[in-house]
Amino acid sequence: MNGHNTYSDAFRHSLWNALICIHVGGTKSSRIEWAEKFTTLHETSSGSYDANGLETNMDLHNNMIGRNWYDKNATQSNYWIFYSVSSPSDEQAANAIYNLAKNSVYCTNVSSIKSNSTKLVHIK
């Protein structure tokens, strides 16, 4: 699996976000929030950033899919003022997101990216 803006790029972005959530500390929601802030800043601070661009929207969308996968597959137990987060393993994340990438949707415009809210997308 390789190639810029292909389903391999979708896999990479999504897995990157899931792994950040798995490995950063904090509550489940703070992990997701931190991953979103960090990866969105990464995407939007580049010199080639275009808020309406196909590539930018693809990357931000696939980042979100990785965070959503983590949200559905991690659990948090609260004990009085303490909490415990149980995250999936790196291997579980990689396998699940690989399966999502194999079914990635080819998109030719931003509206088609947005209409595939639960699927990984690629533009090449």
Which residue stretches match the model-derived regions?
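Intrinsically disordered, low-complexity, mixed-charge
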Residues: M1-K124
